Curated annotation (Swiss-Prot):
Family designation: Belongs to the PsbE/PsbF family.
NCBIfam families for this protein: cyt_b559_beta
Membrane-topology annotation of the record: Single-pass membrane protein
Cofactor-binding details, from the entry: With its partner (PsbE) binds heme. PSII binds additional chlorophylls, carotenoids and specific lipids.
InterPro entries: PSII_cyt_b559_bsu, PSII_cyt_b559_CS, PSII_cyt_b559_N
Function per UniProt: This b-type cytochrome is tightly associated with the reaction center of photosystem II (PSII). PSII is a light-driven water:plastoquinone oxidoreductase that uses light energy to abstract electrons from H(2)O, generating O(2) and a proton gradient subsequently used for ATP formation. It consists of a core antenna complex that captures photons, and an electron transfer chain that converts photonic excitation into a charge separation.
Transmembrane helix is among the record's keywords: yes
PROSITE patterns according to UniProt: CYTOCHROME_B559
A Pfam short name: Cytochrom_B559
Protein name: Cytochrome b559 subunit beta
Cofactor(s) for this UniProt protein: heme b
Gene name of the encoded protein: psbF
A molecular function (GO) term: electron transfer activity
Originating organism: Cyanidioschyzon merolae (strain NIES-3377 / 10D)
Length: 40
C-alpha cells in the first residue's frame, strides 16, 4: 500500500475545510440572489 493511513487524515481535513467553506458560501450567495430578486 502507498502509506494510505498517513495521507488519509490530510485528505479528510482538506475535504472538511473545502465543504465547510463552500456550503455557507453557496447559501450566502443564494440568500443575496433571493433578496435582490424580491426587492425588484
Amino acid at each position: 500500500m502507498k502509506k494510505q493511513p498517513i495521507n488519509y487524515p490530510i485528505f479528510t481535513f482538506r475535504w472538511l475545510a473545502i465543504h465547510g467553506l463552500a456550503v455557507p458560501t453557496v447559501f450566502f450567495f443564494g440568500a443575496i440572489t433571493a433578496m435582490q430578486f424580491i426587492q425588484r
